[in-house]
Curated annotation (Swiss-Prot):
GO molecular function, one term: phosphopyruvate hydratase activity
Subcellular locations according to the entry: Cytoplasm; Secreted; Cell surface
Principal location: cytoplasm
Binding site for (2R)-2-phosphoglycerate: Q163, K340, R369, S370, K391
Binding locations of Mg(2+): D242, E288, D315
Organism name: Bacillus cereus (strain AH187)
Name this polypeptide is given: Enolase
Catalytic activity: (2R)-2-phosphoglycerate = phosphoenolpyruvate + H2O
Keywords: Cytoplasm, Glycolysis, Lyase, Magnesium, Metal-binding, Secreted
Short name of any one Pfam family annotated for the protein: Enolase_C
Length: 431
């Protein structure tokens, strides 16, 4: 047993230059843990509350001093004296201390920072890497990476409607080789875009952010890059999309407006038709948030039409919330959940969502946020839970590469027992 003797939070910066919360946990044994909380750009309306100060004279209103003070003045006195290995007890105490259904009093960014830092300190105390401490000796599966190599939507200053176009190197024999394949396609894509006279600047998540004629064109240039890198789309490498359709859903009309393509007023059924057409023309294996988060009828139609052959991931739809996920499972909506630790606010609740998904035959994709840091906790979470898939950006920007590098270290440490399932990690669909 090692008792927590101090908890300290400070304001630091994320990859977009916005403030976020860093927390340190100290124990009587000398064990120590530190964690930094990520932040999203396109957020689901049902997510746990990220507490911002709102003082326009400081960081344009995005400061997190109140969240930091909540850790130092309210949460710290509550959990000092806890055994650092009592993760569930500490998380439960913070949830009760907040007392709201969405962590709106103390802030999910305050609570999550403590939750993650406690886990790091506990792992340090028992002398285990974080993934092994959290997952035990069964933690050995490296996740298939979903690499966002073209950024659009709210993640880039361009005219592309869909938020992310991803490559999935499912044909690699190891995680290390999947990273090599992804990097080679990334560099090939840069050359393809350059040769077409297109912008090769990158967006929030490290992917390229060119202006393109359509969402279809984004898929076409990625196919060209895959072939240029010496791989075959639909065999070595598949495609994925995070549509983030809530960002272009018109609440007044109840329709979808693809402004970049000049197509407005699309119904849910027309959006589903569009996805079906794209899936026939391209080797798309995963679609995230294809309809608005509140368009459950649309999601049901999408699942009926594509759910047997395409992974349909609920991000804004489920917001890492077991109540939302349970409703989706009951109604037969989607077949996968995106896991973002700051959508729910504690590690305990995060693990509960992953476990619920697996029991229902849904996949779980551990994910970063667009506002990231050098913190690589989600890499360990992906292995600890044998989630099978991770979405943590492109092959550029240190805030993204930090997670890939941590996974490379973990694979190296696991040695011969490391598992990379590739295409088999998509157990929710038929290929």
């Amino acid at each position: 047993m090692s008792t927590i003797i101090d908890v300290y939070a400070r304001e630091v910066l994320d990859s977009r230059g916005n403030p976020t919360v860093e927390v340190e946990v100290y124990t009587e044994s000398g064990a120590f843990g530190r964690a930094i909380v990520p932040s999203g750009a396109s957020t689901g309306e049902h997510e746990a509350v990220e507490l911002r100060d709102g003082d326009k004279s400081r960081y344009l209103g995005k400061g997190v001093v109140n969240a930091v003070n909540n850790v130092n003045e309210i949460i710290a006195p509550e959990i000092v004296g806890f055994d650092v290995t009592d993760q569930a007890g500490i998380d439960r105490a913070m949830i009760e201390l907040d007392g709201t259904p969405n962590k709106g009093k103390l802030g999910a960014n305050a609570i999550l920072g403590v939750s993650m830092a406690v886990a790091h300190a506990a792992a340090d105390f028992v002398g285990l890497p974080l993934y092994r401490y959290l997952g035990g000796f069964n933690a050995k599966q490296l996740p298939t990476p979903m690499m966002n190599i073209i950024n659009g939507g709210s993640h880039a200053d361009n005219n592309v409607d869909f938020q992310e176009f991803m490559i999935l190197p499912v044909g690699a024999p190891t995680f290390k080789e999947s990273i090599r394949m992804g990097a080679e396609v990334f560099h090939a894509l840069k050359a393809v875009l350059h040769d077409k006279g297109l912008n090769t600047a990158v967006g929030d998540e490290g992917g390229f952010a060119p202006n393109l004629g359509s969402n279809r064109e984004a898929l076409e240039v990625i196919i060209e890059a895959i072939e240029k890198a010496g791989y075959k789309a639909g065999e070595n490498v598949f495609l994925g999309m995070d549509v983030a359709s809530s960002e272009f859903y018109n609440k007044e009309t109840g329709k979808y407006d693809l402004a970049g393509e000049g197509r407005t007023g699309l119904t849910s059924a027309e959006m589903v038709d569009f996805y079906e057409e794209l899936c026939k023309d391209f080797p798309i294996i995963s679609i995230e948030d294809g309809l608005d988060e509140n368009d459950w009828d649309g999601h049901k139609l999408l699942t009926e039409r594509l759910g047997s052959k395409v992974q349909l991931v609920g991000d804004d739809l489920f917001v890492t919330n077991t109540q939302k996920l349970a409703e989706g499972i009951e109604k037969g909506i989607s077949n996968s959940i995106l896991i973002k630790v700051n959508q729910i606010g504690t590690l305990t609740e995060t693990f509960e969502a992953i476990e619920m998904a697996k029991r229902a035959g849904y996949t779980a994709v551990v994910s970063h946020r667009s506002g990231e840091t050098e913190d690589a906790t989600i890499a360990d979470i992906a292995v600890a839970t044998n989630a099978g898939q991770i979405k943590t950006g492109s092959m550029s920007r240190t805030d993204r590469i930090a997670k890939y590098n941590q996974l490379l270290r973990i694979e190296d440490e696991l040695g011969e027992i490391a598992v990379y399932d590739g295409i088999k990690s998509f157990y929710n669909i038929k290929r």
